[in-house]
């Protein structure tokens, strides 16, 4: 089944911050657009949806604009560079992060979740009768990295909006 993008702002079923057309337009101005244009539309859509899911694993300042919205943006009650976030649009840096992460995921589908651990370089450790053999080139099945560890450049796009890293247990304190 072909992937379908829903980029409705504050949408209950939204699964992307951008449309495929917006992403294609962005990469038309990119120095290395071939790493995007060599993908099928379905691969691009799947990568955009996946990028949104990973971006939404992070914790952000402010509040969702609508309790029923599926995605973490748009947000309000927070300013970046003295400008209040608006409920009527997605910040450009969030879109840029999605474009670049989608391209990265389209070109390395195992970068975050790892491979199954069946291929690659194996190491063996032996202690008496105990022997352990493991793969050094991949992660075990089900293992998930912090998105910012895998793609630290995302911090440049998302840092101004983030409360903490992925799965952060930090709490916002309001004095007054």
Pin down the residues of each PLM region.
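Divalent metal-cofactor coordination and adjacent catalytic microenvironments
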Residues: 1-176
């Amino acid at each position: 089944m072909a992937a379908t993008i829903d980029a409705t702002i504050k949408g209950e079923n939204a699964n992307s911050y951008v449309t495929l057309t917006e992403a294609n337009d962005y990469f038309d101005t990119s120095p290395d657009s071939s790493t995007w244009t060599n993908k099928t539309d379905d691969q691009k859509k799947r990568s955009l949806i996946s990028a949104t899911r990973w971006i939404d694993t992070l914790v952000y300042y402010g509040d969702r604009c609508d309790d029923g919205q599926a995605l973490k943006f748009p947000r309000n009650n927070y300013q970046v560079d003295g400008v209040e976030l608006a409920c009527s649009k997605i910040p450009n840096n969030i879109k840029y992060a999605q474009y670049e992460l989608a391209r990265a995921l389209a070109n390395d589908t195992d970068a975050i979740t790892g491979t199954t651990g069946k291929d690659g370089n194996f190491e063996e450790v032996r202690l008496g009768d105990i022997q352990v053999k493991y793969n050094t080139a991949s992660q075990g099945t089900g293992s998930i990295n912090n998105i910012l560890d895998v793609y630290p450049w995302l911090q440049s796009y998302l840092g101004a909006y983030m409360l903490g890293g992925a799965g952060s247990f930090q709490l916002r304190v309001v004095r007054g």
